Regions:
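Auxiliary tRNA-acceptor-end handling modules of aminoacyl-tRNA synthetases
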Residues: 1-10, 63-64, 68
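Short clusters of hydrophobic/aromatic residues that line enzyme substrate/ligand-binding pockets
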Residues: 5, 54-56, 295, 304
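Polyanion/phosphate-binding surface patch
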Residues: 32, 36-74
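Glycine-rich, histidine-containing beta strand-loop boundary motifs that form or position
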Residues: 33-36, 162-164, 399
Length: 445
């Protein structure tokens, strides 16, 4: 449940994080990192109470220590949205609104470990929050940014499912369901426990048979485009909140009409278990890997930062970085040939060439090219084998002087040619590596 990647895997994970960061910044989101702990009272008040929160305590604290009691009120955050809301309230006077931030940070949940579910994990979140009112167009922008970001990663295509909690809540209220929040949480479990499981749980919540059947009619509507809204209306349930949700969903789907077919679909089964979501909600899954569950999710909230002096509505999404890279590595969906960021290994075949090897190494590093130098003379085969084993693309053989210049060997092709450390550039770079990985992912996806 606490993944530790090999160096070649960690390189891929960092490249994915770098690409996510770059895409977030293209849309004007600013970087942020919040503390790892939050008051337990804050963490447990935001829904999903079945999530196991890790409590922070001091092992050496005495039973009568007031500090120990204070520590017991702290827990590790299980997502990044709750800490973000607390941060906004705390720094309200120092922020410019609408406030747009991204976080790529760890979270912790005491879940049963399995593929795609970890007790310690990395998430990449974006949120935008404003005073009093947040434009609905931000809901569509979140989906567009998600699509563009995930399309740039070395993963199979992702379908983003969209719903609006006002639809689900308004529909249940139109059915005269007495307590809609527990019913919504149950409906959100459809993909995990199936229609029969949902029916049994709703029966236990004292819903009538007619209410249960009608609720299942809603969440089992086939996902699709704007036509899904018409199918909901055909069910004949009426409520003002339902009408508001359908209008908002129609607006978002219209805004996203230029995305590739299948990139974003309306799906009535997406409810989201967190109580703070009040409008648009999203979940995305990799095509051909739906068994993994959602690789991104999020939604709109109207009351999350309730401690602020004014109402602060917002909308945000989260990408499950650890879930994505865990599947990539488990299914060999992305190449991991390089165990180091090193581009060049400078060889030292004999002691008298050490000075030249040092000059080359320093010159390449000064130009921003990651470079290692072999530290003691040894057989060239040994040095070249080291470069090959670590996936270093180039080996640099220092020349003996004016009559013999430097040589650079391409470790993949075996080709070699003259090298000048003041001008030479590697033919491979991170962008090329990502491009190759993307092609391979598409072939497998």
């Amino acid at each position: 449940g606490f993944p530790e990647w090999l160096p070649q895997q960690r390189i891929v994970e960092l490249e994915i994080q770098d690409e996510i960061r770059r895409r977030f910044e293209l849309y004007g989101f600013a970087p942020l990192e919040t503390r790892s702990v939050e008051p337990l009272s804050v963490l447990v008040a935001k829904g999903e109470t079945d999530k196991e929160i890790y409590v922070v305590d001091r092992l050496a604290a005495g039973t009568a220590s007031p500090e120990r009691d204070a520590d017991r009120r702290l827990g590790l955050h299980y997502d990044l949205t709750v800490p973000f809301a607390r941060y906004v309230v705390q720094h309200y006077n120092e922020l410019d609104f609408p406030f747009k931030r991204y976080q790529i940070q760890r979270g912790w949940r005491g879940e049963r470990p399995q593929e795609g579910r970890y007790r310690e994990f990395v998430q990449a979140d974006i949120d935008v929050i404003d005073r009093d009112r947040l434009a609905l167009s931000f809901d569509a922008e979140m989906v567009r940014l998600l699509h563009e970001t995930l399309a740039a990663l070395p993963i199979p295509p992702v379908t983003i499912a969209i719903n609006n909690r006002k639809i689900t809540e308004g529909y249940l209220r139109g059915l005269d369901v007495a307590d809609v929040i527990p019913a919504m949480r149950i409906l959100d479990k459809l993909d995990k426990i199936g229609a029969d499981g949902v029916r049994r749980m709703l029966d236990a919540e004292a819903l009538t048979g007619a209410q249960v059947s009608a609720a299942l009619e809603l969440v089992t509507i086939a996902p699709g485009g704007r036509e899904v809204i018409g199918r909901v209306e055909e069910l004949g349930v009426r409520h003002a909140l339902l009408d508001d949700g359908l209008a908002e969903l129609a607006f978002v789907m219209d805004e996203l009409s230029t995305l590739p077919a299948g990139a974003a679909v309306a799906n009535m089964a997406i409810v989201r278990g967190f109580d703070y979501y009040t409008g648009s909600v999203y979940e995305g899954s990799m095509r051909g890997h739906e068994d993994l569950g959602a690789v991104c999710s999020g939604g709109r909230y109207e009351n999350l930062a309730a401690g602020a002096r004014v109402r602060l509505p917002g909308v945000g999404v989260s990408i499950g970085v650890s879930r994505i890279v865990g599947r990539l590595f488990a299914r060999d969906l992305v190449p991991t040939p390089r165990k180091t960021p090193t581009e060049v290994l400078v060889l030292v075949p004999e002691e008298r060439l050490r000075w030249r090897a040092q000059e080359v190494t320093h010159a390449l590093r000064e130009r921003g090219i990651p470079t290692e130098m072999w530290h003691e003379p040894s057989k060239l085969n040994k040095q070249l084998r080291y470069a090959d084993n670590k996936g270093i693309p180039y080996a640099w053989l220092p020349g003996r002087g004016d009559d013999e210049g430097d040589l650079v060997r391409d470790m993949v092709s075996g080709d070699q040619g003259a090298g000048d450390p003041s001008a030479w550039l590697p033919a491979t770079d991170r962008a090329t590596a990502r491009s190759r990985a993307r092609v391979r992912a598409e072939e497998r996806g």
